[in-house]
Amino acid sequence: MQRVITYIDGFNLYFGMKAQYNNKYLWLDVEALSNSLLIPGQSLVATKYFTSMVTNQPDKEKRQRTYLDALKSSTGCLFYYGRYQSNIINCRGCGSNWPSPKEKMTDVNIATQMLMDAFTDKFDVAILISGDTDLIPPIEA
């Protein structure tokens, strides 16, 4: 039986699904999704979910917390967290400045975890769910 670990870029998956399907799949059970990708002879040994917690936006924070709490209580997903870094955006037209949060560490966390799991022989097959091309190099490694 082949051991499978699924690595999920939560931020990328969320915005990709939202862009493609609007709100239809925002409550996606990522462990069920992972199981649906298996072929005969494979067994899911872990689903690893990578994200950063939203800050300074109470409505978004609450929605994210609610979703992650639901996943934690109904699945065996393992969670890994990055962070948000606030960059200042300047409007050249009007001179106004405003904060623009940027997710950090998710790609690094996924790549690190994937390589550590490969090195310690935790899986035979790794499935990466992301649309981020930054993750191509660790996959090719």
PLM regions and their residue ranges:
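Domain-level signal for Mg2+-assisted phosphodiester chemistry and nucleotide/NA-binding surfaces
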Residues: M1-P99
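Nuclease catalytic cores that cleave nucleic-acid phosphodiester bonds
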Residues: L78-A141
